[in-house]
Amino acid sequence: MSIERTLSIIKPDAVAKNVVGQIVARFEQAGLKVIAARMQQLSRTDAERFYAVHKERPFFKDLVDFMVSGPVFVQVLEGESAIQKNRDLMGATDPKKAAPGTIRADFADSIDANAVHGSDAPETAAVEVAFFFPEINIHSR
């Protein structure tokens, strides 16, 4: 096992429901540490840049529109196997297919408004963390 860092975004739907604290508590209860965090309103340009990998997909415009529809809570999580642990806690992308007790099963409304984003691999985690948090703003604890 190795200590990893991963990016977690609590999306506009979950922020609007006022469940940020409940979601962060789940990460902490699973042994993940929040080592950087902030609430922010994404600009359209930032959302398009962050999700550029999906630019040619039919859902790209709707995804960007959703991500700029309200503030997001962006955080870096650190811990043993943080990437997989975060993905397990989030559950399936489609909340209808998410296991009971996962974040998406409990807080998401649809495959589009699915409460959270998490990095899917070490390489993407490094890129995604750097997108939101220059190294100077990350503090292991």
From Swiss-Prot:
Task: Enumerate the active-site residues.
Answer: H117 (pros-phosphohistidine intermediate)
Q: What is its main location?
A: cytoplasm
Ranges annotated as spanning the membrane = none
User: Cellular component GO terms, alphabetically?
Assistant: cytoplasm
Q: Known InterPro entries for this protein?
A: NDK-like_dom, NDK-like_dom_sf, Nucleoside_diP_kinase, Nucleoside_diP_kinase_AS
Q: Could you tell me what reaction this enzyme catalyses?
A: a 2'-deoxyribonucleoside 5'-diphosphate + ATP = a 2'-deoxyribonucleoside 5'-triphosphate + ADP; a ribonucleoside 5'-diphosphate + ATP = a ribonucleoside 5'-triphosphate + ADP
Record-level GO BP terms: CTP biosynthetic process; GTP biosynthetic process; UTP biosynthetic process
Q: Where in the cell is it found?
A: Cytoplasm
Which residues of this UniProt protein bind ATP? K11, F59, R87, T93, R104, N114
Provide the GO MF annotations for this entry: ATP binding; metal ion binding; nucleoside diphosphate kinase activity
**UniProt EC number:** 2.7.4.6
Q: How does it assemble?
A: Homotetramer.
Q: What is this protein called?
A: Nucleoside diphosphate kinase
